[in-house]
Each structure stands twice: as C-alpha cells, then as structure tokens.
C-alpha cells in the first residue's frame, strides 16, 4: 500500500476516478443496448414511430459516447468505433424498409 501521504492521496483519487469511470462506461453500454433493442423492434415492425424511437435512442447513445470521449473516459478511436457500429446496425434496415 501507499507509504506516504501523497501516495495515499493518489491511491484514493485513482479509486474515486475508477468508480466514476466505471459508472460512465456502464451508462454508455446501457444506452447502446437500449438502441439495439429499438433497432430490433424496428426491424420486426417497421413503422415511423419505431424508426423515430430508434433514432432518438441513437442520439442519446451518441451524446453519452461523445461526453465520455470528451472527459477522457473513452479513447477517441474507441468512441468513434462504437458510434460507427451503432450506425451500421440501422442503415441496412432503413434501406430495405
């Protein structure tokens, strides 16, 4: 464990940041899952309402991913990759519907 006050403080700060980052990453994953379920609902029943719901959830997921990147929780390339994968889920369904 830490041998002096500054090392102890850094350990406490690291733990605080770890918990904060974990909750933020968890919320990103939750919003991504919500979006994917909305896309599946739209694929099963392509209505304008379900498409709007999917687009709304996509915007929410994009927003949370961008904020995580801005705060340094996710690497910029990781955020871009997540956003790209989310967009690629809806695009083929929109073209066929």
Curated annotation (Swiss-Prot):
InterPro entries, from UniProt? Ribosomal_bS20 (IPR002583), Ribosomal_bS20_sf (IPR036510)
Sequence segments annotated as region (Disordered): 1-20, 75-97
- One Gene Ontology term of the molecular function aspect: structural constituent of ribosome
According to the UniProt record, which cysteines are disulfide-bonded?
Answer: none
Kindly give the PANTHER family that the UniProt entry links to this protein.
Answer: 30S RIBOSOMAL PROTEIN S20, SMALL RIBOSOMAL SUBUNIT PROTEIN BS20C
Tell me, in a sentence or two, what this protein's role is.
Answer: Binds directly to 16S ribosomal RNA.
Recorded protein name is: Small ribosomal subunit protein bS20
The protein's organism comes out as Nostoc sp. (strain PCC 7120 / SAG 25.82 / UTEX 2576)
């Amino acid at each position: 464990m830490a041998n002096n006050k500054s090392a102890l403080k850094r350990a406490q700060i690291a733990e605080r940041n770890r918990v904060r980052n974990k909750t933020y990453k968890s919320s990103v994953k939750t919003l991504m899952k919500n979006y994917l379920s909305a896309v599946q609902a739209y694929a099963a029943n392509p209505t304008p309402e379900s498409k709007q719901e999917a687009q709304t959830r996509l915007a929410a997921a994009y927003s949370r991913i961008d904020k995580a990147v801005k705060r340094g929780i996710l690497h910029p390339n990781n955020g871009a990759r997540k956003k790209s994968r989310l967009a690629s889920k809806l695009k083929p369904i929109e073209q066929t519907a």
